């Protein structure tokens, strides 16, 4: 069977999954990568579209609400003499040349961007990261920031998507490896003659059903109660049924 046929059958047929123990490990590894791509697509899509909307909103606020400014010698320089707050796509954007705001104040706003007197602060879900202007080019103007947003949008989305895939792939490989360890316990209780190597391949295909289900839920932005426990319960049941399809050890009676 090709990978696509295996994918379809792995969603409902423990008997076909059981046959994969004779495959090469390379095919199973490739399969886990493909599952990772599938599982990462909804998250990558929503994060990417959210990032683009935030960047567009930030650009609009810069154009309309904030005065011209220059970042030079590690400081924000402008004719404006007071701090300004605006909102765009769920983010609070603070422009403060007066040093009235600090990192703590930006962080308290949960989701916020701060263009402060001597640093740039980004807060997401109440966790702030800051970058001193001394790390930036010798001079940066408002028009340069807007141009940079336009030029780097595609690169930022690509990097974010790649990071999401890598994190997802790492999670899936850990999931398969741990499920294979559970498989060692199951195969001993069922008296099956299987190596960890074979159990890893079986586990790679056994996570298909849960991966497809949670991919659909993420695409629909639906919340699943006890997602972690449900995921592992489904994986455990599928692997248990797969191992039941494999013949047990033959017991030789000595007379």
From Swiss-Prot:
<keyword id="KW-0472">Membrane</keyword>
<feature type="transmembrane region" description="Helical">
    <location>
        <begin position="223"/>
        <end position="243"/>
    </location>
</feature>
<dbReference type="Pfam" id="PF06691">
    <property type="entry name" value="DUF1189"/>
</dbReference>
<dbReference type="InterPro" id="IPR009574">
    <property type="entry name" value="DUF1189"/>
</dbReference>
<feature type="transmembrane region" description="Helical">
    <location>
        <begin position="199"/>
        <end position="218"/>
    </location>
</feature>
<dbReference type="GO" id="GO:0005886">
    <property type="term" value="C:plasma membrane"/>
</dbReference>
<keyword id="KW-1133">Transmembrane helix</keyword>
<feature type="transmembrane region" description="Helical">
    <location>
        <begin position="154"/>
        <end position="174"/>
    </location>
</feature>
<protein>
    <recommendedName>
        <fullName>Uncharacterized protein YqgB</fullName>
    </recommendedName>
</protein>
<keyword id="KW-0812">Transmembrane</keyword>
<feature type="transmembrane region" description="Helical">
    <location>
        <begin position="28"/>
        <end position="48"/>
    </location>
</feature>
<keyword id="KW-1003">Cell membrane</keyword>
């Amino acid at each position: 069977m090709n990978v696509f046929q295996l994918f379809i059958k792995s969603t409902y047929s423990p008997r076909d999954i059981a046959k994969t123990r004779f495959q090469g490990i390379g095919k199973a590894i490739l399969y886990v990568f493909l599952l990772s791509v599938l599982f990462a697509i909804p998250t990558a899509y929503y994060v990417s579209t959210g990032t683009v909307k935030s960047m567009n909103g930030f650009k609009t606020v810069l154009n309309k609400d904030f005065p011209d400014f220059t970042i030079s010698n590690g400081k924000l320089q402008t004719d404006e003499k007071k701090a300004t707050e605006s909102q765009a796509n769920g983010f609070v954007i603070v422009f403060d040349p007066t040093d009235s705001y600090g990192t703590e104040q930006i962080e308290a706003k949960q989701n916020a961007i701060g263009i402060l007197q001597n640093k740039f602060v980004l807060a997401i879900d109440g966790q702030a990261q800051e970058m001193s202007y001394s790390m930036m080019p010798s001079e940066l103007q408002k028009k340069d920031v807007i141009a940079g947003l336009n030029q780097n949008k595609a690169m930022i989305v690509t990097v974010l998507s790649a990071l999401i895939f890598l994190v997802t792939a790492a999670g899936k490989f850990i999931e398969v490896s741990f499920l294979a360890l559970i498989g060692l316990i199951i195969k001993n209780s069922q008296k099956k003659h299987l190596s960890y190597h074979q159990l890893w391949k079986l586990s790679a295909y056994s996570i298909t059903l849960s991966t497809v289900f949670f991919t659909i839920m993420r695409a629909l932005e639906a919340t699943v109660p006890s997602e972690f426990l449900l995921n592992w319960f489904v994986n455990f049941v599928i692997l248990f049924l797969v191992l039941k399809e494999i013949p047990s050890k033959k017991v030789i009676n000595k007379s």
